[in-house]
Amino acid sequence: MSSLSAGPVLVLGGARSGKSSFSERLVEASGFTMHYVATGRAWDDEMRERIDHHRTRRGEGWTTHEEPLDLVGILRRIDDPSHVVLIDCLTLWVTNLMLEERDMTAEFAALVAYLPEARARLVFVSNEVGLGIVPENRMAREFRDHAGRLHQIVAEKSAEVYFVAAGLPLKMKG
């Protein structure tokens, strides 16, 4: 595994692709103080189990921050050049923003504007949802479109981009 880039890193993949595990290994190998920003909400028992599984897998040595909406705010609060921050995941953040009827363009612009200011190393995890069929309902299509746009703008600003499938990372940029 290579050393962690100074610029943002984006790790994309499908559900259960191994993207979170790969990202955690990348962060753990960095030698920086590890922070984890969880954007998911425990809406039900199944989601609580997923969150618990991720927390158990990470083990000790991580400081966890739960922030479903104010991603830039939490990143600013924990920004330090000795930190590496794993944000898992952007697609759950998009879901939360949509459910709260936030201005997606403004939220995405705020995140992208923050990236050059960040002193901590940032590793973003996100689900690639644009590889399947066109969703049949409007909300699902809007979600797919928002996620796709966010991935493109974060990838453009990232030093490294990976796509993970079957637990195997493919380096796409950097």
Swiss-Prot record:
SUPFAM superfamilies: P-loop containing nucleoside triphosphate hydrolases (SSF52540). Transmembrane segments: none annotated. It is an enzyme of class 2 (transferase). Its EC number is 2.7.1.156, 2.7.7.62. The active site is at H54. Keywords: ATP-binding, Cobalamin biosynthesis, GTP-binding, Kinase, Nucleotide-binding, Transferase. GO terms for biological process: cobalamin biosynthetic process. It comes from the Bacteria. InterPro entries: CobU/CobP, P-loop_NTPase. The keyword Ligase does not apply. One of its GO terms (molecular function) is cobinamide phosphate guanylyltransferase activity. It catalyses: adenosylcob(III)inamide + GTP = adenosylcob(III)inamide phosphate + GDP + H(+); adenosylcob(III)inamide + ATP = adenosylcob(III)inamide phosphate + ADP + H(+); adenosylcob(III)inamide phosphate + GTP + H(+) = adenosylcob(III)inamide-GDP + diphosphate. Pfam families: CobU. The keyword Kinase applies. Pathway: Cofactor biosynthesis; adenosylcobalamin biosynthesis; adenosylcobalamin from cob(II)yrinate a,c-diamide: step 5/7; Cofactor biosynthesis; adenosylcobalamin biosynthesis; adenosylcobalamin from cob(II)yrinate a,c-diamide: step 6/7. Belongs to the CobU/CobP family. Homodimer. Catalyzes ATP-dependent phosphorylation of adenosylcobinamide and addition of GMP to adenosylcobinamide phosphate. This is Bifunctional adenosylcobalamin biosynthesis protein CobP. The gene is cobP.
